[in-house]
Amino acid sequence: MWRPSENQVYVPPPAPVSKVIPTDAYVKRTNIYYHASSSRLLAVGNPYFAIRPANKTLVPKVSGFQYRVFKMVLPDPNKFALPDTSIYDPTTQRLVWACIGLEVGRGQPLGVGISGHPLLNKLDDVENSASYAAGPGQDNRVNVAMDYKQTQLCLVGCAPPLGEHWGKGKQCNNVSVKDGDCPPLELITSVIEDGDMVDTGFGAMNFAELQPNKSDVPLDICTATCKYPDYLQMAADPYGDRLFFYLRKEQMFARHFFNRAGTVGEDVSQDLVIKSASKNTVPNAIYFNTPSGSLVSSETQLFNKPFWLQKAQGHNNGICWGNQLFVTVVDTTRSTNMTICAATTQSPPSTYTSEQYKQYMRHVEEFDLQFMFQLCSITLTAEVMAYLHTMNAGILEQWNFGLSPPPNGTLEDKYRYVQSQAITCQKPPPEKAKQDPYAKLSFWEVDLREKFSSELDQYPLGRKFLLQTGVQARSSVRVGRKRPASAATSSSKQKRSRKK
């Protein structure tokens, strides 16, 4: 008996899938280059927590283990005073910036910053146990300090970077949950903002939700969320706006090994141990280690050196859409925490007493960002405009382009007195002002709209660019020299000497 094939038949989609076009296909680069610098950027604060008396921040939290996300605001090239106005036609073309190089300058000396907790949940030293562990008491917390994992990171893109961390997930309705049960975990992807904590060696997780005892990790992260860059998600971005390229260096080793105090939620399986008559209870097996970033050296620095962008990893080859650029920096090799003391009395004491001095902690950071930008033009054909509108409609709106709405066949009602109570409530008018999509996010905004210069030989990064590319800088000073003698003058002098 004949039977039809039981294999599944896959029907192709009704319309072809749109293909992502790289920026090099419709962006034309010019031979005009500009240099921009942020000048010196400084930050000072407490490395562990912000000082907020009466819910007002007096001293911010500034740590060497925070992300520094710089939002660089660039000038509009279409309103820029260009040296050559014939490079593009404003009726059919628009200008954009392309980032072709940058140098992240870091000040301050190399140093290792430590963190800790005065009441850390540490029970036993399980690395070198001398005897059988005794049962934990009601409070076994001790004062412990440590250094963190070492990280150097630089992310560059025209959109904010993404980070990932583990948070508390949602429990299913058909699962009974008791107090003290381990919550489900969920991988959360969010935007990395300025001031977010990096992975310090204890995992990328929301410690406020998953460690409510506030004593399993040091002070600076016990109520915070440590994020790790979501490289997989940013690499899968179809347009490649979030990550042009990145620089990364991480290192860590385990320094000390401890275990936690508290009731063990999941006992060690009986198949894994053999008890004895005298030792019939299995000790606590909730182990953890204190991280360490080891040696910091100037030989392994990623900063204070130029990097040039020839080809980005995604489809966006350095084009700064929206006239903005995001630079995310992490540098834990300059995480020194300075201790400052102040005398409580005006007159200096004759003898030392520790109560007569107040101790404070501060961390300082110093940055200097330099960029090289190339001027580019885009010819506004119908295909290019349709593609840009699909990719990001805000680009065309910034260029004062709009799409006409489809014709409406219905008859609309418009009242004469809109604010009258005699008629039904009218819909509020739509907001005409363009909303910043990143208004609710926190970034370190740096205005570069008045920092562009075409005199490349006047800046360190500009001179490095001229040296590597071989482009000749325009000199505004002419060196005076004697005019060479003409051929007629020299021949007449020879004739006079012959007559003599």
Swiss-Prot record:
Keyword Ribosomal protein attached: no
Region (Disordered): 473-500
GO-annotated cellular components: host cell nucleus; T=7 icosahedral viral capsid
A Pfam short name: Late_protein_L1
Subcellular location: Virion; Host nucleus
Principal location listed in the UniProt entry: virion
Superkingdom field: Viruses
Record GO biological process: endocytosis involved in viral entry into host cell; virion attachment to host cell
SUPFAM superfamilies in alphabetical order: Group I dsDNA viruses
GO terms for MF: structural molecule activity
Keyword vocabulary terms for this entry: Capsid protein, Disulfide bond, Host nucleus, Host-virus interaction, Late protein, T=7 icosahedral capsid protein, Viral attachment to host cell, Viral penetration into host cytoplasm, Virion, Virus endocytosis by host, Virus entry into host cell
Subunit structure, interactors included: Self-assembles into homopentamers. The capsid has an icosahedral symmetry and consists of 72 capsomers, with each capsomer being a pentamer of L1. Interacts with the minor capsid protein L2; this interaction is necessary for viral genome encapsidation. Interacts with protein E2; this interaction enhances E2-dependent replication and transcription activation.
Function: Forms an icosahedral capsid with a T=7 symmetry and a 50 nm diameter. The capsid is composed of 72 pentamers linked to each other by disulfide bonds and associated with L2 proteins. Binds to heparan sulfate proteoglycans on cell surface of basal layer keratinocytes to provide initial virion attachment. This binding mediates a conformational change in the virus capsid that facilitates efficient infection. The virion enters the host cell via endocytosis. During virus trafficking, L1 protein dissociates from the viral DNA and the genomic DNA is released to the host nucleus.
Family recorded in the similarity comment: Belongs to the papillomaviridae L1 protein family.
Protein name: Major capsid protein L1
Record organism: Human papillomavirus 44
